[in-house]
Amino acid sequence: MVEWLISDQLINYNYAVKFMEKKIQQIHNNSSDELVWLLQHPPLYTAGISATDDDVVEKLLPIYKTGRGGKYTYHGPGQRIIYLMLNLKKRNKCDIKLYIRELGSWIINVLKHFNIFGEFKEDRIGVWVNNNGVEEKIAAFGIRLRKWITYHGIALNFSPDLSHYKGIIPCGLKGYGVTSIKELGVKAPLFKLDNILKKEFYKIF
């Protein structure tokens, strides 16, 4: 069984990491169900295990070093953070590349509900859209596993302040832009996105 948690208030980043670490230990001990946590963070940057100082253009916001995969990314209001704590071993899916591809398929299927056509890129992990001939990232992935239990996850741009990305080179990729569901001309309440995320989740996971 997968539990779903939706947090309405902005969640402190360090608190979120501690929460996930506690939860995955409980999942490992069979004392808790798997969890999908939908939330938003206050404006900040996170630096994954591959991050380098060269990817910081200007320190506009606080930077948090974290153990997830990837480089620098932005989190803030209007961005739907999706943290997944899933036991891949119990699901007989001990394949990290398969898991990442399934995350991509999930988000692509969600975006179709908004008439947005995303594409998963294995060489530039995440979901991208073609915006008038320009490739722009709409969802960033950063995951970590412990004893084949996942944590961290996806940052899907719903309606964030995209100007905050100017302080970093997102995911270490120069020459590419970022976009959001709102930026692509879609007006919808956040709860609609959450409902679609849940509906499409069970078709893949």
Curated annotation (Swiss-Prot):
The active site is at 171 (acyl-thioester intermediate). Substrate binds at residues 68-75, 140-142, 153-155. Keywords: Acyltransferase, Cytoplasm, Transferase. Pfam families: LplA-B_cat. It is found in: Cytoplasm. CDD domains: LipB. Its main location: cytoplasm. It comes from the Bacteria. One of its GO terms (cellular component) is cytoplasm. Residues 30-205 form the BPL/LPL catalytic domain. GO terms for biological process: protein modification process. Catalyzes the transfer of endogenously produced octanoic acid from octanoyl-acyl-carrier-protein onto the lipoyl domains of lipoate-dependent enzymes. Lipoyl-ACP can also act as a substrate although octanoyl-ACP is likely to be the physiological substrate. This is Octanoyltransferase. The lineage of its organism: Bacteria, Pseudomonadati, Pseudomonadota, Alphaproteobacteria, Rickettsiales.
